Regions:
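N-terminal secretory signal peptides that target proteins for export/translocation
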Residues: 1-5
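Surface-exposed patches in mature extracellular/periplasmic domains of secreted proteins
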Residues: 56-67, 104-109, 114-117
Length: 177
């Protein structure tokens, strides 16, 4: 009886130790999850570079009114990327590389091109920068987005970033709600 209890405790402890490893192995086995993680990382890196460029090159030239409007816009629950002009990867690289980032990736984790947007002409524009991935299916859903997370296993969701934050991002729903 004691041996059986000890064996049960040992097996229970081992399963608790191996469970996170099995979860990581399952994660590694999912090419879509890896592609999504790489895409989020790329967007975060390029977005951070764009943000540093903005802080150094654009923000000092903005009017107080433009700063106030941008602050108000940052609290919006919806955004429309059409308000920011598209810029080519090459033109963006000419602005950011090598000072702010080593390179601008051409494609997301699924091999689809990123879309880059940057307003280089009007320092008083309310929205200045954006970039996005179309997700696994390679098709952008729209330019208008509600600011919120999406189920991380929905790999076809667009992943847009704008003016310093993710507009849509993969995140598991909170439990208990």
């Amino acid at each position: 009886m004691i041996v059986r209890i000890q064996r049960t405790l040992l097996l229970g402890t081992l399963s608790l130790l191996l469970l996170p490893t099995a979860s990581r192995a399952q994660e590694a086995a999912s090419p879509d999850l890896l592609a999504q993680k790489r895409t989020v990382s790329d967007i975060r890196n390029v977005g951070t570079a764009m943000w540093h460029w903005y802080k150094e090159e654009v923000a000092p030239k903005r009017s107080k009114k433009a700063h106030e409007q941008a602050e108000k816009e940052s609290k919006a629950t919806t955004v429309d990327l059409q308000r920011v002009p598209v810029i080519s990867r090459e033109d963006l690289a000419a602005i950011l590389v090598p000072r702010y980032v080593a390179a601008i990736p051409a494609a997301d984790g699924w091999g689809h091109p990123y879309e880059f947007r940057l307003n280089t002409k009007d320092p008083n524009a309310i929205l200045v920068m954006a970039l996005r991935s179309a997700g696994r299916d390679g098709k952008f859903s729209d330019t208008h987005y509600e600011v919120k997370a999406f189920e991380p296993t929905d790999f076809d969701q667009d992943i847009p970033w704008m003016d310093g934050y993710f507009v849509r991002w993969p995140q598991k729903p909170e439990s208990g709600r």
